[in-house]
């Protein structure tokens, strides 16, 4: 049988990213401190932060189009009328806006200020929607999905997509 599937080409551009740490030769030759490990760790953190920012908020100019970009980014997100106006219903709508095959392993992405607001959300019986991890390595969840924080996610404000889910 014939299917309705179609394919098209997408150009994935490469973008340059660099960082620099000045280290003296004296410090490099110091055997007491693992400077190479430290520098390597710092490179990883810096580049990781820049990539996280670009993949979330990038505008397509010398960086990828981020998932929060107004054109080419995510079509659906939690947007509110104002500060502290997120509702449980909006979160449920966001979860079910994602197709079922992708929903099971999806996570919420938000900043710490938004986490603080979500932790205060309650259901009709006064029970918190937020579920802290029961064991040491268990993640916190809301509506059964893990929460990931990013300093690059916008805060809750009128028109901002302050929560991503996917």
List each model region and its residues:
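Structured, hydrophobic secondary-structure cores that serve as assembly/anchoring elements
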Residues: 1-166
């Amino acid at each position: 049988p014939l299917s309705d599937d179609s394919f098209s080409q997408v150009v994935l551009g490469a973008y340059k990213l660099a960082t620099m740490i000045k280290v003296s030769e004296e410090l490099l030759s110091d055997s007491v401190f693992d400077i190479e490990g430290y520098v390597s760790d710092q490179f990883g953190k810096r580049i990781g932060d820049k990539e996280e920012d670009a993949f979330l908020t990038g505008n397509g100019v010398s960086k990828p189009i981020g998932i929060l970009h107004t054109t080419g980014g995510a079509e659906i997100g939690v947007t509110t009328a104002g500060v502290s106006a997120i509702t449980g219903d909006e979160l449920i709508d966001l979860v079910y806006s994602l197709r079922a095959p992708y929903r099971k392993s999806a996570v919420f992405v938000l900043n710490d200020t938004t986490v603080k607001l979500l932790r205060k959300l309650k259901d009709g019986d006064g029970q918190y929607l937020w579920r802290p991890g029961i064991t040491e390595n268990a993640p916190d969840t809301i509506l059964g999905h893990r929460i990931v924080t990013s300093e690059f996610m916008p805060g809750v404000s009128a028109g901002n997509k302050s929560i991503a889910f996917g």
